[in-house]
Amino acid sequence: MVILVLNCGRSSIKYQVIDMEAQSSKLLAKGLVERIGLPEGDLTHKPVGKEKFELHQPIPDHTTGISLVLQALTDPVHGVIRSLDEVKAVGHRVAHGGEFFPESCLVTEQVQEKIRSLFQIAPLHNPANLEGILSIEKVLPGVKQVAVFDTSFHQTLPATNFMYALPYEYYQKYGIRKYGFHGTSHKFVAREGAKLAGLDINNSKIITCHIGNGGSITAVLNGKSYDTSMGFSPVDGLVMGTRCGNVDPSAVTFIGEKEQMSYAEVNNMLNKQSGVFGVSGVSSDMRDIDLAYDEGNPRAILARDMHYGRIRKFVGEYAAEMGGVDMIVFTGGVGENS
């Protein structure tokens, strides 16, 4: 059975094609569609065992982008399947499932409506994730679709860890609480790490560190998420590439008032102008920060020390919270390569 996996962003589509009939799942191809909606779009298709294929043309929307992906998958030269009939299901990464979805689920009209209802608290991700689902309905009608939510794994957090000490009515009215993200990654690496280490996942204390341009850390107690560094949004927690992580809210309101910033401008500052980029003034990429660090750039030194210091702080906090730790697992671009 061939599965197509999609991660749809606002102007991009990441995809993988996996053969699940093999004794162990086998990657057939992966690729990336970029610059959707811009005058010149790009498709990079990487079939396993074949030459990489690139296409450059306008890609006005996600439906067009996914159609180009399907054409590449069945191309006589660059393709990996003979017919689209071989694609039996499509899996979608969906950033935010709120409190609706403790597990992955088949996509129905009701599921689509719940994803849509979360647009306000996940405006950067959920609209594009839903667009991918709707596009598949157009180009692969009748194929089963599964939504895999970043937030699902963290639905086991105890209330003491997911509630904020704000007036309780805001949780009741607006769902203001810690949701956590990167849950699919944390769940997978905790289980794989336990297998490699010979640990019983159901009787273990594991700390998983997903460190990339965005990053989060999770305390996994007996196989379940017990605490996690991201909060109501992915801006909370670690010092990330362009996201600030933990910060006193009063500092944010003070800056907004002094700079006469709108809500959108404040949100942009926290999400896109802060983190190691904001502190260093050099880059959001840790490879660039490392080079500047080695050159003695004082702000790059400060940014890197803050970045790694916050990781150590959360690891220590979660070890104390669980009463010890059996294993620490690193994943993500920085976590795996730094």
Where are these regions (language model features)?
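Glycine-rich phosphate-binding loops at beta-strand->alpha-helix junctions
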Residues: D326-S338
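Glycine-rich phosphate-binding loop of actin/hexokinase-like ATP-binding domains
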Residues: F153-K258
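Adenine-nucleotide phosphate-binding core of ATP-dependent small-molecule kinases
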Residues: N268, G275-V279, M286-M322
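Short beta-strand-loop/turn "lid" adjacent to the catalytic site in phosphate-handling enzymes
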Residues: L73, V77-H125, V146, S152-N161
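Oxyanion-binding "anion nests"
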Residues: A251, G256-V282
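Phosphate/pyrophosphate-binding loops at sites that engage ATP/ADP/AMP, CoA/4′-phosphopantetheine
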Residues: A72-K88, G193-D200, V315-D326
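N-terminal glycine/serine-rich phosphate-binding loop of ATP-dependent small-molecule kinases
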Residues: M1-G98
